[in-house]
From Swiss-Prot:
This is Phenylalanine--tRNA ligase beta subunit. It catalyses: tRNA(Phe) + L-phenylalanine + ATP = L-phenylalanyl-tRNA(Phe) + AMP + diphosphate + H(+). It comes from Thermosynechococcus vestitus (strain NIES-2133 / IAM M-273 / BP-1). One of its GO terms (biological process) is phenylalanyl-tRNA aminoacylation. Its main location: cytoplasm. Binds 2 magnesium ions per tetramer. The gene is pheT. The keyword Nucleotide-binding applies.
């Protein structure tokens, strides 16, 4: 917003230097982006009177003027303007003057042999317009030799000010004046509101108001003013508009723009006779409604606009005549022949105008204010001043005023606690240099600061030991942005000055961190991604018909009628879908919740499921003689085992046949420290064939709570131990064992025979399995590699042999295996 310092000083008697005022406003939250000092634009330019104007002897387009500038002898000035003539009062830049807007220093010079002692100026050369057809001439009474700056509005300073989105009241000169008065303590001089006596909507008269949606238009005031005389506005009004960046049009339109700048209340003037013609009825029904499909409106910018249901309209006889709160229509605009006007002053809902303007890609001074929120309390004051100016400047006569008013009450009372003020703002900078005690705002200062802003405070009854508590009444013009106690405290800090409070750090700070459970979940996800699995996510809702499911009574669709009881089903279906689409085999995992019910009631817990069906050869370079091979049980188990090893978990695998979806000979229950962790196995060939997917697909499902609890134990008690620098000794152990005997059972026996994890046995690894020719019936050939190592010395051959033989004897004794090596 462009704020004229000269206009501002008419409203508030502030005598601060403009730089200091700009600094105070900026510190109070109204950033001054630029200071436009117009006083420098025409320094050294005075009023001159052209006594004579003759053609230049050596140039056809130049004229030689004799100009009286009030300094004795007339000055000879060469001028090229086509409108230069004797008898005109003109602005003259004397030698030594500097025209800042065109960066020109005036010096005496010879032009085509004729001496020129100055320059007769156009408005463009003085910075008031971009282009000019000739020199500027004064039509009002002026005095030769006087400074032209007061005559042209160049004795002013313009502050380019930006307000925050919540301060809609600051988009007006009255709002800024109130703020400056509060910041500086200077007296505020606002015009006394004139009274208007509108009749209620529905009463007999030339205008009938029809508001279709009071939520979109809480108040609408229409005034019929007759016998107006359209003419140029007086100079002071034109200068006010020009300083604000608006173009003067005629006295009626200029008055509406002036009120918008002063009060922040948009107004619009319709040509009454044209409005009657459009309505084609008496009395004229002026309405406010949303647009209908297919309606159009030609706006003041000459564009034919196709309207949508988001556009709020002003209508005459239900015919659109204006985009409410945005722009008027061309058909009813005020023109040089206008004799009667209908003046609109209304309140429109901010969201409605925002959507309407966005839908049309149109933003105006009016819509900018409506989008922020117009002060509902001063509608009558703005209307009354506009009517008074129309009577004074346009010689109009008020014929009728109608008001449709459904504004909500604008009263708000808040409780303010001095204790809360001290807690949020802290101590103030003490004026006593030798004082070590922190100083805080006292009640009197708080009351003074808020009173300056127009708040009314009354102290409540408090006990002797308690701090002061106030009941604060919010002024109507701050009704939109002051809603809570903290808003009042912000106003106190803003007015007192943020730089006048002590710089204090919070008494206690705590470094932010993820909870341990989330940290472990992130590590689990990273581990499975590192093993080549992609994280998947499925709906918790599945098709019903399975036992123990929790079913919804009235599902939206049958496919999502029950809650899932496991993750494996969803993972297999995802594999099947990708297989049907021709995508590569799926390797993925999912962390999710499963649900069920039993005789004890409903239950739910978190699980981690996965599917491993990736072909290790697909998409790879292979030898021509080599065919892609499906994943083996041990390869799939190795992927899962790599994750467990990453976390240092010793998981045992025990044969299991309970899940009919899984291969009975290739399914294992996973146990961790004697507690069931989950299940791992290959899909049953018949189940895979039913789904028309490959048989070499492996799935697992883990109890997430068990997994995280074990990880949490290790996380809280991390044990570091050095690597052994001594050599290891490997021994291979091969034997025939019954097929029903699991590798997990054999591994446990080997470790137990060696003396546990603290023995010289470092690792046990199965590296070969064979069943077929040469192997006794009902048995298989297994080969283990055992690694022995000590942490403090090199083991002797005798020590290794003794321990290795103990393990061999234990296997023979317990399982009657047939040793092969």
């Amino acid at each position: 917003m462009r704020v004229s310092l000269r206009w501002l000083r008419e409203l508030v008697a502030v005598d601060l230097d403009v730089t200091m005022l700009a600094d105070r406003l900026t510190m109070a939250g109204f950033e001054v982006e630029d200071i436009e000092d117009r006083r420098t634009w025409a320094e050294g330019v005075v009023v001159g009177y052209i006594l004579a104007c003759e053609p230049h002897p050596n140039a056809q387009k130049l004229r030689v003027c004799q100009v009286d500038v009030g300094q004795g002898e007339p000055r000879t000035i060469v001028c090229g303007a086509p409108n230069a003539a004797a008898g005109l009062y003109v602005p003259v830049a004397l030698p030594g003057a500097y025209l800042a807007k065109i960066d020109l220093k005036i010096r005496p010079a010879k032009l085509r042999g004729v001496k020129s002692e100055g320059m007769i100026c156009s408005l463009a050369e003085l910075g008031l317009t971009k282009e000019s057809e000739g020199i500027h001439t004064f039509t009002d009474a002026v005095t030769v030799g006087e400074d032209v700056r007061p005559l042209l509005g160049l004795d002013d300073v313009i502050l380019h000010l930006t307000s925050t989105a919540n301060r809609a009241d600051a988009l007006s000169m009255v709002g800024i004046a109130r703020e400056v008065a509060a910041l500086t303590g200077a007296p505020l001089t606002l015009p006394t509101p004139r009274a208007i006596a509108p009749k209620k909507s529905g009463a007999k008269g030339p205008v009938q108001l029809a508001i279709a949606d009071p939520q979109a238009c809480p108040a609408y005031c229409g005034t019929l003013i007759t016998h107006v005389q359209i003419a140029p506005s007086p100079l002071w009004l034109q200068q006010r508009l020009e300083a604000a960046g608006l173009r003067a049009i005629n006295n009626v339109v200029d008055i509406t723009n002036y009120i918008l700048l002063k009060w922040g209340q948009p107004l619009h003037a319709f040509d009454w006779d044209r409005l009657q013609k459009v309505a084609a009825q008496t009395p004229v029904s002026v309405g406010v409604r949303f647009a209908k499909a297919g309606e159009t409106l030609k706006t003041l910018d000459g564009q034919e606009r196709r309207l949508s249901s988001e556009n709020l309209l002003i209508t005459a006889g239900d015919v659109p005549v204006a985009l409410a709160g945005v722009m008027g229509g061309e058909e009813t605009e005020v023109h040089p022949g206008t004799q009667n006007v209908f003046l609109e002053a209304a309140l429109f809902a901010s969201p409605v105008i925002r959507r309407s303007a966005r839908a049309q890609g149109l933003r105006t001074e009016a819509s900018a204010r409506y989008e922020r929120g117009v002060n509902p309390a001063e509608l009558e004051a703005a209307t009354a001043e506009a009517i008074a100016l129309l009577k004074e400047i346009a010689q109009g006569t008020v014929s009728d005023t109608t008001l449709a008013d459904q504004r909500p009450p604008l009263e708000r009372t808040l409780t303010l606690r001095l204790e809360q003020v001290h807690r949020l703002l802290g101590a103030v900078v003490s004026e006593a240099e030798d004082s070590d005690e922190p100083a805080y705002l006292d009640p009197e200062t708080v009351e003074e600061l808020l009173s300056r802003l127009g708040f009314h405070l009354s102290r409540q009854e408090t006990l002797e030991d308690e701090l002061v508590v106030w009941s604060v009444t919010v002024p109507p013009y701050r009704f939109r942005d002051i809603e809570r106690e903290v808003d009042l405290i912000e106003e106190i800090a803003r007015l007192y000055g943020y730089d006048r409070f002590e710089e204090t750090l919070p008494a206690q700070t705590e470094v932010g961190a993820l909870p341990l459970e989330l940290t472990l979940l992130r590590e689990v996800r990273a581990a499975f991604r590192g093993a080549g699995l992609t994280e998947l996510m499925h709906y918790s809702w599945v098709k019903g018909g399975q036992p123990n499911q929790v079913t919804v009574v009235n599902p939206l669709v049958a496919e999502f009628s029950s809650l899932r009881t496991d993750l494996i089903t969803g993972l297999v279906q995802a594999f099947r879908y990708n297989h049907e689409q021709g995508n590569p085999p799926l390797n993925g995992f999912e962390i999710g919740r499963v649900f069920g019910q039993d005789e004890e009631g409903l239950w739910e817990n978190d699980r981690l499921g996965g599917i491993i069906g990736g072909d290790p050869w697909q998409g790879k370079w292979v030898r021509r003689s080599q065919q892609p091979q499906p994943l083996t049980w041990y390869e799939a188990k190795g992927i899962l085992e790599s994750v467990f090893q990453r976390f240092g978990l010793n998981v045992e695998y025990q044969s299991d046949r309970h899940d009919e979806r899984l291969h009975p000979g290739r399914t294992a229950v996973l146990c961790l420290q004697g507690e069931r962790l989950g299940i791992f196995g290959q899909l049953h060939p018949q189940y895979a064939a039913t789904l028309e997917i490959p048989a070499a697909i492996y799935v697992f499902e883990l109890d997430l709570e068990v997994l995280l609890s074990r990880l949490e134990e290790r996380y809280r008690q991390i044990v570091f131990q050095p690597f052994s620098t001594y050599p290891a000794s490997d021994r291979d152990l091969a034997f025939f064992a019954p097929t029903a005997l699991t590798v997990a059972e054999l591994s446990r026996t080997i470790w137990k025979a060696a003396g546990g994890r603290d023995s010289f046995l470092e690792s046990v690894e199965l590296f070969d399995e064979y069943s077929g020719s040469g192997v006794p019936a009902g048995q298989r050939s297994l080969a283990f590699r055992l690694t022995y190592r000590a942490s403090d010395r090199t083991l002797t051959e005798a020590e290794v042999n003794e321990l290795h033989q103990r393990i061999r004897d234990s296997l023979v004794e317990k399982y009657a295996v047939t040793l092969r090596s």
